[in-house]
């Protein structure tokens, strides 16, 4: 996202947070605003002329705002209308940045609602585990990544996988990401995990362990990693019995291989 667009997004995040903090129903308003912003983006994705008109610098701000109100007024909640109107009054580098910005705002609204319910950490972990499930099911990922299938078809497929297993926030975030793919499904979901963690100022540590980690083990590992990296760390783990023992930890692009399998590979390499 270009500089002008980043500045616009920062202002809109403040507008969104202010509105959510002032409402008596933060959960309901956050959920409605988030899902409605996703719907707005879907409309903009399908209409190039509209998205160009809404950021056209040749049109004055009032004209762009009135256009947005004529399209969405009475069809979305007051909170969503306020965000969309504020968005089109900003300067965006291109239409893609506008749409990506609205997606981020939709996600933020949903996550603020989840946080108000004490569910943000759960959402983060559910997204991580969902990514791992899809990663282990190549046929499922292939179907979810099929650009020949409509966004609705991909969402319907994932909805069947998710039904009754995750929070409504996790479901809404995952379905939106799968319906609007920019990269592989697993990568989309992993990006979401990073985004959720970043709201709490945390960096994600992805751990593959030979045996399931208990909460105390995760907490101890998190403390150690925080001392190494000098920032808050969110530990998410999965079981990989092929490691034989120990664990492999990935933080960003850095990998710490403390697994038995890794030690054996290094030993063989040194002997060879």
Swiss-Prot record:
Q: Tell me, what's a Pfam family for it?
A: OSCP
Keywords from the UniProt entry: ATP synthesis, Cell membrane, CF(1), Hydrogen ion transport, Ion transport, Membrane, Transport
Task: Say which domain of life the source belongs to.
Answer: Bacteria
InterPro entries, per the entry: ATP_synth_OSCP/delta_N_sf, ATPase_OSCP/d_CS, ATPase_OSCP/dsu
Record localization: Cell membrane
Q: Name one GO molecular function term.
A: proton-transporting ATP synthase activity, rotational mechanism
GO cellular component terms, A-Z: plasma membrane; proton-transporting ATP synthase complex
Q: How does it sit in the membrane?
A: Peripheral membrane protein
The disulfide bonds in this chain are: none
Q: Which family does the UniProt entry place this protein in?
A: Belongs to the ATPase delta chain family.
General function of this protein: F(1)F(0) ATP synthase produces ATP from ADP in the presence of a proton or sodium gradient. F-type ATPases consist of two structural domains, F(1) containing the extramembraneous catalytic core and F(0) containing the membrane proton channel, linked together by a central stalk and a peripheral stalk. During catalysis, ATP synthesis in the catalytic domain of F(1) is coupled via a rotary mechanism of the central stalk subunits to proton translocation. This protein is part of the stalk that links CF(0) to CF(1). It either transmits conformational changes from CF(0) to CF(1) or is implicated in proton conduction.
Question: How the protein assembles, per its UniProt entry?
Answer: F-type ATPases have 2 components, F(1) - the catalytic core - and F(0) - the membrane proton channel. F(1) has five subunits: alpha(3), beta(3), gamma(1), delta(1), epsilon(1). F(0) has three main subunits: a(1), b(2) and c(10-14). The alpha and beta chains form an alternating ring which encloses part of the gamma chain. F(1) is attached to F(0) by a central stalk formed by the gamma and epsilon chains, while a peripheral stalk is formed by the delta and b chains.
What is the name of this protein? ATP synthase subunit delta
UniProt organism field: Corynebacterium jeikeium (strain K411)
């Amino acid at each position: 996202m270009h500089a002008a667009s980043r500045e616009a997004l920062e202002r809109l995040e403040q507008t969104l947070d202010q509105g959510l903090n002032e409402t008596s129903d933060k959960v309901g308003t956050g959920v409605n605003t988030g899902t409605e912003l996703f719907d707005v983006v879907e409309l903009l994705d399908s209409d190039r002329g509209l998205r160009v008109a809404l950021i056209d610098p040749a049109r004055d701000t009032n004209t762009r705002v009135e256009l947005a109100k004529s399209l969405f007024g009475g069809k979305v909640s007051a909170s969503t209308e306020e965000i969309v109107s504020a968005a089109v009054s900003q300067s965006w580098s291109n239409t893609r940045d506008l749409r990506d910005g609205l997606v981020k705002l939709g996600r933020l609204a949903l996550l603020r609602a989840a946080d108000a319910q004490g569910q943000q950490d759960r959402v983060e972990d559910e997204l991580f585990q969902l990514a791992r499930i899809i990663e282990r099911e190549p046929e499922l990922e292939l179907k979810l990544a099929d650009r020949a299938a409509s966004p609705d078809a991909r969402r319907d497929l994932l909805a069947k996988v998710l039904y009754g297993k995750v929070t409504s926030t996790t479901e809404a975030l995952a379905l939106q990401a799968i319906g609007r793919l920019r990269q592989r499904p697993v990568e989309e979901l992993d990006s979401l995990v990073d985004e959720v963690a970043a709201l709490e100022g945390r960096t994600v540590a992805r751990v593959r362990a030979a045996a399931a980690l208990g909460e105390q083990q995760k907490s101890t590992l998190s403390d150690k990693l925080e001392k190494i990296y000098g920032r808050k760390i969110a530990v998410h783990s999965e079981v990989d019995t092929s490691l034989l023992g120990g664990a492999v930890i990935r933080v960003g692009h850095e990998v710490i291989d403390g697994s038995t399998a890794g030690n054996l590979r290094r030993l063989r390499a040194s002997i060879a």
